[in-house]
Amino acid sequence: MKVRSPCQAGAFYAGTKSSLTKQIDSCFLHKLGPGKLPAPNKKGKRSIVALVCPHAGYMYSGPVAANSYFALAKDGIPETCVIMGPNHTGMGSGVSIMIEGAWETPLGTSSIDAETAKKIQEQSKIIDVDESAHRLEHSIEVQLPFLQYTYGTNLKFVPICMMMQDLTTSCEVGEAISNAISGSNAIIIASSDMTHYENQAAASKKDMSVIEQILGLDEESL
């Protein structure tokens, strides 16, 4: 089995199991985080469809991301997770998916949901099987330790790295994911930094505008 080694351990997040566990602890307990540690709700009915989580270093956005994972833990236990992230490196295809193997972090090794990944790839002509786009990309990798911390390493996932993010491409990818996971207990995580170097007022204004468009399913305005 192919195992992707972490490229950001010791950079975007702590590089050892003990130090990373403590770092994620502090993200959840931080004043900008939920203020307590997550406890997965085994009886949760799973109503959350998707999360939007930042992908900066944990020292910058970890507590904000922790709010999303705390809500997800309270909501229940998903069976699989589709993680979508932007391509910062310029490597690989315009939309790249991995359909086999596993990813390693200091917290352990999580397997790719091969069945779901293949279904997604088969539903779209624009999604390519391409490992090179993922090799040095951080946007998806930084989500994985939060999932492993919350649910352990048994939760499988599907990584999709997007260099092309125009409306047509995004709609096609979204439809492929929707068709592939329809009727399943899956969560979608959109890895996105909504703000860089702006004050709270400006960031909140932009955030609320985007949230309104997401809730209204208005992809063109978004």
Set out the residue ranges of the language-model regions:
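Active-site histidine-anchored catalytic micro-motif
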Residues: 1-222
